[in-house]
Design a protein with these regions (language model features):
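Positively charged, polyanion-binding regions of nucleic-acid-associated proteins
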Residues: 1-23
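Alpha-helix C-caps/helix-loop-beta hinges
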Residues: 17, 70-71
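A short acidic, leucine-rich amphipathic alpha-helix
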Residues: 24-28, 67
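Short, positively charged loop/turn segments that connect secondary-structure elements
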Residues: 31-58
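Short, amphipathic alpha-helical interaction segments positioned at domain boundaries
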Residues: 82-90
């Protein structure tokens, strides 16, 4: 699946579920066989010290950043318990 197809599928998933976590996005990437792992991160455009997610490659970060810039999705803080529930990690 190309970047545009990934973006369309992500927007649909996010709208259908009324929001998703980065863990759920990674699970989606795994399901479609998209190689997202790397050394890049998504951080706040206003404060580079605020990191939203890391260990993705440039293409994966670009997909999310483009969706946010195009105002197709928005990033909002999630309850940390969601990540514990989804990953089983504390």
């Amino acid at each position: 699946m190309n970047s545009e197809g990934i973006k369309l599928s992500l927007v649909k998933m996010i709208k259908d579920k009324r929001g998703v976590s980065f863990v759920e996005i990674e699970n989606f990437f795994d399901e479609i066989g998209f190689d997202y792992l790397g050394d890049e991160m998504i951080n706040s455009g206003e404060n580079k010290k605020i990191i939203y997610w890391c260990d993705w490659n440039e293409q994966a970060c670009g997909v999310i950043i483009e969706l946010v810039k195009d105002e197709l999705v928005e990033m909002t803080p999630a309850n940390p318990l969601i990540y514990i529930w989804l990953t089983g990690k504390v």
